[in-house]
């Protein structure tokens, strides 16, 4: 048999494996440094019995960077941990590591070594399922795939959720499966959070995970945040305090506790915890963004107290805090160039500092990003609209972006905020000019979106009386 035929045969076997090379993990090239950093943080600071999968993911990341020898070392570490962590399932848990070994050796041109690991996988499949294939369907493998997808970012979360659901169907009381499922449901709930969402399902999955993992401080901290989301802040704080007293996953607990106290308005404590976490993980984009948000909240608080007219010491405090917020937001986007939320926060702070050019450039950069999900697009258009309305004093352009946020078919807080901002702006224009056809049409459109058909018709009819040939089935697009 020719070399090419041998290679094709091995490739066919490799593609049957269940491992990081076949799970179609969605990782953009610009995200690799941040992903590698997060994996290192988890290896160093996350107290878990499931580090085999983390070392496997690190090996895959090393391969993506072209560092195959380093990847082999990470796989060796995963192999060394398999027996201590999974004594009762070491053979099944080894299949992912062996699959990664096989793929890695194949990419390095080591066909004989690749075949050795393929044979290892095949032997386990034959032993446990009487199958001669190179893959096995079992909840442990579904769980391994779920963890890999979960750790690779938001574009993989829906598939991760399906994997953990499959695993839980077989073993609903499994602590590891429950933990993975609770985390991915929490993340997805955060992405898709609409104002009318109760978060009850997410809350129940977290409570189940805490019940099955009573010593897991990480999960307790997430439960505390979710309780805060659903207006049970006092109950949530109990879990946060409990997590803070634990020695487990301290750095991660600091992160989430800081977020909790920032949202509660206890900004000094939030900053203290953020700085403690940053001391351990200075390359965390998430932490830099959270720290920047603490400073931003301080600015909002000063403006609130001074009725948006800070003077004297208050003005000096804002001038001191704004550069600190900018510094952390800049660091966040530098560490994670696809961090859309941080770009929006950074643009707002540039505007606060009076640097409209940098603010405009930053908004344009994030608007031009590929594969931005609906919720984030609404967030960007709303905040860009605010910048255009209040900093650039461009009502026409602001209206355009509020409309873009509203037209996206997705219920979200930022969509509601855009509706309210657009209604205020159109009403203000109408008070200046009662015959403003554009504002009448926009108000008609807003009431239509809100399901208030009678009110919508009233505004459309007023607009038609002023311009009989006006098309009212869609909102008037602002003229540029």
List where the protein language model places each region.
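TPR alpha-solenoid repeat register
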Residues: 54, 97, 131, 177, ...
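N-terminal alpha-helical scaffolding segments that mark the starts
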Residues: 1-56, 477-479
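Solenoidal tandem-repeat scaffolds enriched in leucines and small polar residues
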Residues: 124, 128-247
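Flexible helix-coil transition and linker loops at the boundaries of alpha-helical arrays
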Residues: 40-47, 81-92, 124-138, 177, ...
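Residue at a conserved register position within TPR or TPR-like alpha-solenoid repeats
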Residues: 62, 105, 149-150, 185, ...
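Helix-turn-helix repeat elements of alpha-solenoid scaffolds
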Residues: 22-38, 64-82, 110-127, 153-161, ...
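"A position-specific structural signal for the A-helix of alpha-solenoid helical repeats
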Residues: 15, 50, 56-57, 64, ...
């Amino acid at each position: 048999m020719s070399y090419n035929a041998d290679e094709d045969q091995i490739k066919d076997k490799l593609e049957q494996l269940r491992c990081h090379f076949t799970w179609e993990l969605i990782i953009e090239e610009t995200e690799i440094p941040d992903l590698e950093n997060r994996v290192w943080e988890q290896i160093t600071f996350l107290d878990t019995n499931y580090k085999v999968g983390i070392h496997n993911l690190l090996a895959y990341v090393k391969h993506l960077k072209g560092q195959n020898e380093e990847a082999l070392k990470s796989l060796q570490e995963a192999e060394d941990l398999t027996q201590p962590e999974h004594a009762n399932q070491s053979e099944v848990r080894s299949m992912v590591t062996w699959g990664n070994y096989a793929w890695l050796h194949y990419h390095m041109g080591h066909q004989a070594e690749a075949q050795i690991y393929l044979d290892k996988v095949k032997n386990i499949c034959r032993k446990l399922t009487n199958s001669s294939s190179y893959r096995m369907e079992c909840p442990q493998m579904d769980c391994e795939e779920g963890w890999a997808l979960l750790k690779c970012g938001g574009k993989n979360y829906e598939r991760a959720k399906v994997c953990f659901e499959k695993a839980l169907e077989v073993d609903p009381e499994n602590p590891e499966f429950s933990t993975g499922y609770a985390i991915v449901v929490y993340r997805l709930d955060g992405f898709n959070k609409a104002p009318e969402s109760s978060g009850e399902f997410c809350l129940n999955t977290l409570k189940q995970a805490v019940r099955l993992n009573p010593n897991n401080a990480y999960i307790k901290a997430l439960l505390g945040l979710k309780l805060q989301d659903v207006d049970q802040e006092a109950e949530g704080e109990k879990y946060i305090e409990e997590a803070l007293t634990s020695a487990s996953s301290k750095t991660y607990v600091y992160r989430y506790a800081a977020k909790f106290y920032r949202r509660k308005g206890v900004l000094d404590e939030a900053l203290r915890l953020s700085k403690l976490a940053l001391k351990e993980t200075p390359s965390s984009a998430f932490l830099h963004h959270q720290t920047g948000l603490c400073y931003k909240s301080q600015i909002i608080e000063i403006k609130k107290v001074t009725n948006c007219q800070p003077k004297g010491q208050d003005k000096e405090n804002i001038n001191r805090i704004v550069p600190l917020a900018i510094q952390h937001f800049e660091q966040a986007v530098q560490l994670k160039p696809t961090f859309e939320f941080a770009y929006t926060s950074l643009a707002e702070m540039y505007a606060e500092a009076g640097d409209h050019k940098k603010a405009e450039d930053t908004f344009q950069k994030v608007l031009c990003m590929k594969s931005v999900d609906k919720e984030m697009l609404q967030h960007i258009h709303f905040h860009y609209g605010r910048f255009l309305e209040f900093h650039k004093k461009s009502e026409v352009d602001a209206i355009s972006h509020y409309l873009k946020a509203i037209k996206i078919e997705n219920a979200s807080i930022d969509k509601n905020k855009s509706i309210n901002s657009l209604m205020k702006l159109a009403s203000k224009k109408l008070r200046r000019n009662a015959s403003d056809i554009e504002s009448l049409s926009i108000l008609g459109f807003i009431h239509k979106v809100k399901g208030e058909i009678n009110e919508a018709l009233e505004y459309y009819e007023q607009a038609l009386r002023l311009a009989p040939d006006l098309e009212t089935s869609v909102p008037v697009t602002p003229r540029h």
